[in-house]
Amino acid sequence: MEYLSNLDPSSLLRSVSNMSADLGRKVWTSAPPRQRPFRVCDNKRTTRKGLTAATRQELLDKALEALVLSGALTLVLEEDGTTVESEEFFQLLEDDTCLMVLELGQSWSPRRSGVLSYGLGQEKPKHSKDIARITFDVYKQSPRDLFGSLNIKATFYGLYSLSCDIQGLGPKKILRELLRWASSLLQGLGHMLLGISSTLRRAVEGTERWQRQGRLKPY
């Protein structure tokens, strides 16, 4: 009882809060961020790539190779040039966010109006309004993927957006799926052959029984 009476309530509360913070930190660090799709381009918007990354640094490393860049890189939002300089800000970005990667000495510039994206070079009429805009991004999650993944994003009247992400498969997964389909096909074919053979057997037995009855019938 004397030991309990000597305990300081504030120190006890501090110890409990520290234990809770340590436990929360361990739970948070045990779950790594997932791979998410992004679209990146260079400062002139002439080259665009679809990449997947879990962290800001991973996206910069992949953009360095995909866009053939060099030196220190800066990541900004393509829409308004906001710098993505922290991992916390990067994790708040939505999937399929359009980002621009700048080399040292380069700066963000707004998109020129009247020109369609992806460098089609076709000018729209001055007073026209977009009805729908569809973007296609083909990317690989792994260099060993046989077919790339496809991301499709459609925006209608600038208000409603719809996106679809079709994941590609590697050689092992494709072979596994082909074997599974072949197994199911052969299994179905086997059941069909068994049904046909059973039907033929019943037909033959019925014919023989009819012939036997015909022989035994008195004239």
From Swiss-Prot:
Primary residence: other
PROSITE patterns documented for this protein: CIDE_N
GO annotation, cellular component aspect: COPI-coated vesicle; COPII vesicle coat; endoplasmic reticulum; endoplasmic reticulum membrane; Golgi apparatus; lipid droplet
Transmembrane segments: none
Bilayer topology: Peripheral membrane protein
SUPFAM superfamilies hit by this protein: CAD & PB1 domains
InterPro entries reported in the protein's UniProt record: CIDE-N_dom
Keyword Membrane: yes
Its biological purpose: Lipid transferase specifically expressed in hepatocytes, which promotes unilocular lipid droplet formation by mediating lipid droplet fusion. Lipid droplet fusion promotes their enlargement, restricting lipolysis and favoring lipid storage. Localizes on the lipid droplet surface, at focal contact sites between lipid droplets, and mediates atypical lipid droplet fusion by promoting directional net neutral lipid transfer from the smaller to larger lipid droplets. The transfer direction may be driven by the internal pressure difference between the contacting lipid droplet pair.
Annotated protein name in UniProt: Lipid transferase CIDEB
Organism the protein comes from: Bos taurus (Bovine)
Originating gene: CIDEB
